[in-house]
Design a protein with these regions (language model features):
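Bacterial N-terminal signal peptides that target proteins for export
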Residues: 2-14
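Bacterial N-terminal signal peptides
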Residues: 11-23
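Bacterial signal peptide processing site
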Residues: 27-29
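Short, conserved catalytic-motif segment at the N-terminal edge
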Residues: 44-99, 121-123
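Short active-site loop at a secondary-structure junction
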Residues: 61-65, 88-145, 189-198, 293, ...
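Short, Gly/Ser/Thr-enriched beta-strand-loop segments that form substrate-interacting elements
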Residues: 83, 334-371, 378-381, 387
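Short, surface-exposed loop or secondary-structure junction motifs
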Residues: 139-353
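Short, gly/Ser/Thr-rich active-site loops of penicillin-recognizing serine hydrolases
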Residues: 331, 340, 386-410
Length: 410
């Protein structure tokens, strides 16, 4: 099952890749802007350097394509689609194709929750049991859910959910079903004692939003985020809707959800067959994403996700005090090791960028914005994981960030 704790490993990869860029004194390697007479389609130098590496990465991960979208005023913007919409096909991807954004949805749910906190409709230190009597541990707070420090079991790691996804991919999951599975298992640790990525946390938050507002979470996201940012192609679909708006690619997955509960990597034999072309990925495009709901079911496009990522990281959707509190909450998942991944109130820190990653059957996404350098990066692929378990979009994001911040300490 994808949409699990990929974020943690992705953050670690990116921290190592762009560690030089994490200090404000390290500016982007600047270059002269293109002359007015330069060809309109000329790409920035960092894009020219990244392009062949991206193509090599796609060949390595077996992803059929990718979309890269960069807003970098000092170095030049770049938007490019690589590859095809279908596996071994000829229908070319475009930058404007729709994509399932997976766990990037968590930042949207988190933003709505923080807006409700600003409005005085709930508090970060409220016990979750105030709204959900089925959460028996009264020490678990709203903040614990947002920061992945509740200790609640992640329902999407259960054999029950993974087997159901393999046997009935079109099933429409009710949020309460997912919560019940998450709460049926013992807690992993005492609230606040550690970090553990769990979709149960975010689905609970989604239901609490609906309880407080009396409206569907999708409507709250639209009114509070999408409409405010003029995101007309971004939505949280209804639980019965497994479609993706056109245009869109097919989304692919190697292996089954049950096979990948413990590890994203296939067996050595299966990896060899995939690379030999005798084991093909299966089409997961219309797998109903309702099993992710508030934690991972949203759909968007690269340009709109880029617009949202910047608003998320700069505080456009929150008051200044709440935004500062949110960014300050982003701390190492292992306090004794500051080099580990960082996570806070519904937001992660990916190298110099605030944002998130997303992964669910068929799709892998990276979303980040660096508010110091005013750089936004969106990457997505229509393959969730390579046969060896590597996340294709994260591998490409690593390449692009490396080129963007090359020489950053000079």
């Amino acid at each position: 099952m994808k949409l699990r704790s990929r974020l943690t490993s992705a953050l670690a990869i990116l921290l190592a890749t762009v560690s030089l860029a994490s200090t404000p004194a390290c500016g982007l390697h600047s270059e002269a802007p293109p002359a007015a007479s330069a060809p309109a389609k000329a790409s920035p130098a960092y894009a020219d350097a990244a392009r062949p590496k991206i193509e090599a990465s796609l060949a390595e991960t077996l992803a059929p394509g990718a979309v890269v979208w960069v807003h970098a005023p000092r170095l030049g913007d770049w938007a490019e689609a690589f590859g095809a919409r279908t596996y071994r096909g000829d229908d070319k991807l475009t930058v404007d194709d729709h994509v399932r954004i997976g766990s990037n949805t968590k930042t949207m749910t988190g933003t709505v929750v923080l807006q409700l906190v600003e409005e005085g409709k709930l508090r970060l230190d409220d016990p979750v049991s105030k709204y959900r009597p089925d959460v028996k541990d009264h020490a678990i707070t709203i903040a614990h859910l947002l920061s992945m420090r509740s200790g609640l079991y992640n329902y999407s790691e259960s054999l029950e959910v993974n087997r159901a996804l393999d046997e009935d991919p079109g099933r429409a999951w009710q949020p309460e079903e997912l919560i019940a599975i998450g709460l049926s298992r013992p807690a992993l640790f005492a609230p606040g004692a550690a970090y553990a990525y769990s979709n149960t946390n975010t689905v609970l938050l989604g239901r609490i939003v609906e309880q407080i507002t009396g409206r569907p979470l999708a409507d709250e996201m639209k009114a509070r985020i999408f409409d405010k940012l003029d995101l007309t192609r971004t939505a949280l679909p209804s639980i019965s809707d497994a479609s993706i708006p056109s245009p869109h690619p097919r989304g692919y997955q190697f292996g089954t959800n049950v096979d990948t509960i413990e590890s994203m990597a296939l067996s050595p034999d299966a990896q060899a067959r995939a690379r030999a072309g005798t084991l093909l990925p299966h089409d997961a495009t219309t797998m109903n994403p309702s099993w992710g709901w508030a934690a991972g079911a949203a759909i968007s496009t690269a340009p709109e996700l880029g617009r949202y990522a910047r608003a998320l990281a700069t505080g456009e959707l929150l008051g200044s005090a709440m935004h500062e509190q949110r960014l300050a909450s982003v701390t190492p998942n292992e306090p004794s090791n500051p080099e580990t991944a960082l996570y806070g109130l519904g937001i992660g820190k990916l190298g110099p960028m605030f944002g998130h990653t997303g992964e669910l059957p068929g799709f892998n996404t990276f979303m980040g914005h660096d508010p110091v350098q005013d750089v936004t990066l969106i990457v997505w692929t229509p393959l969730d994981a390579a046969p060896d378990g590597k996340p294709p979009a994260i591998e490409i994001a690593k390449i692009v960030l490396g080129e963007l911040y090359a020489g950053g300490a000079r």
